[in-house]
Every structure is written in C-alpha cells, then in structure tokens.
A protein has these predicted regions:
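Short alpha-helix carrying the canonical HExxH Zn2+-binding catalytic motif
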Residues: 74-86
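Gly-Asp-aromatic-enriched flexible segments
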Residues: 211-390
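N-terminal, motif-rich segments that launch catalysis or mediate targeting to/interaction with membranes
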Residues: 1-76, 91-205, 209-216
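Hydrophobic alpha-helical elements and their junctions with loops/disorder across both membrane
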Residues: 13-15, 20, 81, 203, ...
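Short alpha-helix boundary/capping elements
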Residues: 85-90, 315
Length: 390
C-alpha cells in the first residue's frame, strides 16, 4: 500500500533520524526508557538479553499496530525493526567497542592515507545493489516472544558473518580495489536483506494470525546449540572461559577437542532398548569442567528441554564429571557423577516459567584430564497438545 515506499526509503533509516524528525522519533523509542531518543542498541549489537528485549518490543509494537489496521504506525515500527537487524549485520557496526576501527588499525595497519581517518563510514559507504530475487522469507515464530527469539539467533549469524567481511573490506580499501571493497559489503548487505525479509514476513503473519502448517510445524523444536550463551555477550568466549580442564576446556560447538587441538565428533555411550551403544551427535557442545553455559529462552514458548549429558565415548575414559541444569537459578537436574565408561543421561525437563537456563559441568574428582563433557542435542520443544500462544 501507500506505506511500502516510505518503509523502504525513509522508515528503515528512522533510528538515524530521531533528532531531525521529531514526528518519527517516537517510533524508535521505548516506554521503558522515557526521554531517551537515541538507543545505541538500534545501531550496535549488544548482549543477547538486550537484543532480545529490543526485538520483542519493536516487533510487538509493529504487530499490535497492524492488527488494529494502523498501517502507518506498523510501517514506522517495522522500519526501526529492520534498521536494527541490518545494522547488527553491517560490517561497520560489528567490531565490539571499536566502531571507528581505531583498535582494529593496530592489527591491520592502514597506509598513510588512512592513518588518521576514522574508518566507520568508509567500511559502509560502498556503491552496490542489494538483490535477493527469488528469496522466499521464512516464518520466525507464531508469537512475538518466539519470533524475537528466532530472529535473535539469525541476527547473531548475521553479526558473525559480517565480521568475516571486515578484513576483506579493509584490505580492499587500503589497496584501492573498489570492486572487492563493494563486493564484500554487498555480501553482508544481502544477508541482512534476507533477515529483514524474514522479519517483515513474520510481522505480517503474526498480525493476520496466518501460519502455514508446514511453517508452524518446523518451529516445534529448536536446536539450542547455535545460540550464543550469555557468557559470550559479544558472540565470542572471553578469557574467563579458558580456565578449565582438560586443555582449556572452553565450549566447542559440534565437537570435542583431542589434546585441545583436533576436533572429534561428539559421541556418547547411551542405553537404547536395554543395550549400550555409542551415539554420535551432529549437534551439541563439547566442554571441559568448571564450565557454565547460560541461555536466554522466551517464557512459556517452549514446554520442555531435552539433552543427553555425559562423557565423550572416546576421550572421557578417565573423566569424573557432575552435570547440573538450572532454570531461573533453581535446580532442574543434578546428576550423580558420570565416570569413565558410564552411559550418558538423557533428560527431558519442564520449562514452565523459565527464562534462564544454565548447563553446568564440574569436576567430580580425579585430575580432570579426561573431563571431556558433552551436551548432546540440546533442544527446546513446544507442547504439541495445545495450540501456539499468539
């Protein structure tokens, strides 16, 4: 309708216009922060909790407006929503605490021409076309809290992807290679455009309460493996995560590390139909002991949490590990220590009211050298016996 063009050409820049367009500024502000016009989080990715709060608020506002046929208001809130999603995946915005690349220059020194120039604008000022022809947007959820949660993960993927373009962009800029400079920016921009399309499509589906059965069915269970834990607020593990056993013990997605160097597929001894077998997990996290992984989850969207917890079938022969799972700080599971070749525990835990889920692995004795702990196939499941909350 009439708001399509303003959404594409004006509202998507709305958070940048809060001081010059008083009429638009309220659509980039939050009730919880009255009087604050410029929300930094709409431009720079923050912690998972902060980003989730922003996604929930602005997606919710847009959905509420569209449900009441306030198309103009919905389009303005949608502009803020897609702006932050695209900025979180823009190479110029994704280096933590270094928006002007002053620290980055120390790692990748520029030629004299750029020695004293803040590089932020140059990293995002290419000339290219963003085309996602043929892309079919995907549904991110059947409720606002669920959709914000799924968009959070996809935005984290966008941030990581954009970080991979920073060095190619700077190398091309330093070398005066305009084509390569534009191409690296374009790659990240197309990723962001697809994410924005997912958000807009989901917004409309939520407002009109229309969900294809296949789309909704695909959201019945969610793999928690690829969500960033709260211990990695900037999507990488800080130094504090590297002080555990064995090796450095830090969380490794999809693998355990032999001697701290060689990735080994996640494998656990499990009991199936009364027999013990070794199961390889494509999805999961390998950790050492003194490990805590904390995940934000949307309240009452998912009914249960399932995971297999144990020692790696090949590397954990001398291990002694205690596994605990906490929800909102209260113990959901406290397993008797797993030792050596003991089979893993398979857990199925209720999640009612829980917004904070912690997976904890600690040493239960020994020297820790065999404490190759595995969280296999951690996933969130909806209650299939009732309709989705909308």
């Amino acid at each position: 309708g009439a708001e399509r063009q303003p959404l594409a050409s004006l509202y998507c820049a709305l958070p940048d216009l809060v001081y010059s367009r008083a009429d638009l500024a309220p659509y980039a502000m939050m009730d919880s922060r009255p009087g604050v016009k410029y929300l930094v989080g709409l431009h720079l990715p923050a912690s998972p909790a902060d980003n989730y709060a922003l996604l929930t608020y602005f997606l919710g506002r847009a959905v509420d407006a569209l449900r009441t046929n306030n198309v103009a208001g919905a389009a303005r809130y949608a502009g803020t929503l897609v702006h932050m999603l695209e900025d979180w995946g823009c190479p110029a915005h994704v280096v933590p605490d270094d928006n002007m690349f002053t620290l980055f220059k120390q790692f990748l020194p520029p030629p004299e021409k750029y020695a004293h120039v803040p590089l932020h604008s140059l990293v995002e000022s290419g000339t290219f076309t963003v085309a996602i022809d043929g892309y079919r947007p995907s549904l991110a959820g059947t409720s606002v809290p669920e959709a914000a949660f799924i968009l959070l993960r996809r935005s984290q993927e966008g941030t990581r992807f954009a970080r991979g373009q920073v060095v190619p962009i700077l190398n091309a800029l330093y070398a005066g290679d305009t084509n390569a400079w534009n191409a690296a920016q374009q790659t990240a921009a197309c990723f962001g455009a697809r994410l924005a399309a997912d958000a807009l499509y989901t917004l409309i589906c939520l407002a009109r309460d229309r969900f294809g059965p296949d789309e909704a069915g695909a959201l019945q269970r969610i793999d928690l493996t690829y969500y960033a834990p709260l211990e990695a607020p900037d999507l990488y593990l800080p130094q504090a995560a590297f002080f555990s056993r064995p090796y450095w013990g830090y969380a490794t997605v999809g693998a355990s590390l032999r001697d701290g160097k060689t990735a080994v597929p996640l494998a656990l001894r499990v009991s199936e139909a009364g027999r013990e077998t070794i199961r390889v997990f494509e999805h999961g996290v390998g950790v050492g002991t003194r490990s805590v992984l904390t995940y934000l989850i949307p309240k009452d969207v998912y009914a249960r949490f399932q995971v297999s917890a144990g020692l790696h079938a090949e590397l954990g022969g001398s291990g002694h590990v205690r596994f605990e799972i906490l929800g909102n700080g209260k113990r959901l599971a406290d397993l008797s220590p797993v030792q050596g070749t003991m089979p893993a525990h398979t857990l199925d835990l209720p999640l009612a009211g829980i917004t904070n889920l912690q997976l904890i692995a600690t040493s239960a004795g020994g020297d820790g050298s065999g404490n190759h702990a595995v969280w296999g196939a951690p996933r969130l499941l909806k209650d299939t016996r009732k309709g989705s909350e909308r």
